[in-house]
Amino acid sequence: MGLPWYRVHTVVLNDPGRLLSVHIMHTALVAGWAGSMALYELAVFDPSDPVLDPMWRQGMFVIPFMTRLGITNSWGGWSITGGTITNSGIWSYEGVAGAHIVLSGLCFLAAIWHWVYWDLEIFSDERTGKPSLDLPKIFGIHLFLSGVACFGFGAFHVTGLYGPGIWVSDPYGLTGRVQSVNPAWGVGGFDPFVPGGIASHHIAAGTLGILAGLFHLSVRPPQRLYKGLRMGNIETVLSSSIAAVFFAAFVVAGTMWYGSATTPIELFGPTRYQWDQGYFQQEIYRRIGAGLAENQSLSEAWSKIPEKLAFYDYIGNNPAKGGLFRAGSMDNGDGIAVGWLGHPVFRDKEGRELFVRRMPTFFETFPVVLVDGDGIVRADVPFRRAESKYSVEQVGVTVEFYGGELNGVSYSDPATVKKYARRAQLGEIFELDRAALKSDGVFRSSPRGWFTFGHVSFALLFFFGHIWHGARTLFRDVFAGIDPDLDAQVEFGAFQKLGDPTTKRQAV
C-alpha cells in the first residue's frame, strides 16, 4: 500500500499495539532531546557571574526550567546562585539530564517491543476477537493518573513536604532562591505573580482530575452522546488531545511573555513591558529618593543600587529588541556585560538636571533628546547642525556619574557628553565585552522571546489541527462521500485503513 507522506499515520489507525509503540517512541525522542540539550547547555554554560552573565543572557533554554523546579547545583561543583559546593546530590543538573537519557533509552526499547509484539490480548474485544479499545475507560484512567500527578506536584513538590519547593523571588528579581511554598487558598491565589497559587491550583486541579477520572471509570457515556461525539473513533481522541495541547500552549505563551510566578525574571530575563513601563527605573529612583531622605549623598545613594537591578534596567535585556530570526544568545548580540559604569546625570550650564529620553522598544534608532524635570526639551544631538538650537555645545551640557565604576567622574567635553547621552537612551550604561564571542552589536532576544514565539506558532498550527481532525471525525460519513441512495450498507469504522479491500458490503 503506497501512502503519501501526509497519510502515513493511517498505518496505526486500527492497530492499538503499534499506536502505543509510536507514542512511546515519541516520548523517547522528547526525553532524549531534553537530556541531550541539558548536557549541551551545561557544557557551554559559564556559571561564574550570575549577576551580569546569567543563564538567560547566555541563551540557556532548558536550564531555567530545571532551576525553577528546584535544581540549583552541578556535579561540576558550582551553584546557579554563585559560589562552590561540595555535595550536590543525585538531583543535580547532570543527574536530571542523565535521568532523561536513561528514560529515553528505556522508552526506545519499550517502543520496539510493542512494535514487534503488537497483537496483544488486551487490545482485542473478547466478544468479536477484533482490535478494540474502550476509549471512555482509557480516558478515565489517564484523567485519574494525571490528576494524581498534578495533586502530588502541588501538595508535595511545591510545598516542600516531599521535594525541594520551587524558585521564588521578589518582584524585582533580586533575591531569588529555591524554597517551599504554602498554598494560597484566598483571592490572592489568583494573582499570577503569587507563587502560592501554583501549589493551590495544582492541588485543586489534581483533586478535580482524580474525581473526574473516577467518574469516567464508573459511569458509561449515554449512547446518543457516545455516537454524537464519535467516542468510539480514535480520531476523536486525536482531535481532543490536540485541543488540550494548543490550549496549554497559548496559556504558557501568555504567562511567559507577560510574566508570572512561573517565569521568574532571574531565570528567563525581564519582560518587554518592564522596559516599556520603566518598571526597574521607578524602583531605582524610589531607592535613591529613600537614600536622599536619610541624608545620603547622591554618590552614596547610587552606590547602594544593586548592580543586578541596574542591569535589568538596560534595553539590551528586553526580549522584544531581538529579531525573531536573529540566531544566538543575547551575549552574541551586544556582548558580555563586564561592569556597570554608573548612572549619568546631565546638567546644562544653568545647573538644571536633564534626563535623556529612552528608546522605545520598537525603534532601532531614536533622536537623542534631553528634557528637564517638567518634560521641556533643553538639549539634543541635532541631525542638522546648521539649524540646531539645543545642541550639547550650545546648551553647555555636562555629565557626572554616580555609583558604578565611574563614580564621581564628570565630563564637559561635548563629544564625550554626547557619547554617554546616546548610551543613556538604552537605560543604565554598562561596559560590554564584544570581543570574547565576536558579538556583532545587534540585539538578540532572550529565551523568553523564543519560548513565546515557538509556543504561539505551534498553538496556531495545533488549533488548525484540532479543527481539521475534529471535522474529519464528526463528519466522516459526509467526507467519505456516502450517497443517501446507496444500495449497499457499508460498515464504516470496522475497517478504516486506506485502500482496504476487505470492508464488508451487504445488500440492504
UniProtKB/Swiss-Prot annotation:
The chain crosses the membrane at residues 21-36, 101-115, 140-156, 203-218, 237-252, 457-472. The keyword Ion transport does not apply. It is a multi-pass membrane protein. Keywords: Chlorophyll, Chloroplast, Chromophore, Membrane, Photosynthesis, Photosystem II, Plastid, Thylakoid, Transmembrane, Transmembrane helix. Its main location: plastid. Disulfide bonds: none annotated. One of its GO terms (biological process) is photosynthetic electron transport in photosystem II. Binds multiple chlorophylls. PSII binds additional chlorophylls, carotenoids and specific lipids. It is found in: Plastid, Chloroplast thylakoid membrane. InterPro entries: PS_antenna-like, PS_II_antenna-like_sf, PSII_PsbB. GO terms for cellular component: chloroplast thylakoid membrane; photosystem II. GO terms for molecular function: chlorophyll binding; electron transporter, transferring electrons within the cyclic electron transport pathway of photosynthesis activity. NCBIfam families: PS_II_CP47. Belongs to the PsbB/PsbC family. PsbB subfamily. PSII is composed of 1 copy each of membrane proteins PsbA, PsbB, PsbC, PsbD, PsbE, PsbF, PsbH, PsbI, PsbJ, PsbK, PsbL, PsbM, PsbT, PsbX, PsbY, PsbZ, Psb30/Ycf12, at least 3 peripheral proteins of the oxygen-evolving complex and a large number of cofactors. It forms dimeric complexes. One of the components of the core complex of photosystem II (PSII). It binds chlorophyll and helps catalyze the primary light-induced photochemical processes of PSII. PSII is a light-driven water:plastoquinone oxidoreductase, using light energy to abstract electrons from H(2)O, generating O(2) and a proton gradient subsequently used for ATP formation. This is Photosystem II CP47 reaction center protein. It comes from Pelargonium hortorum. The gene is psbB.
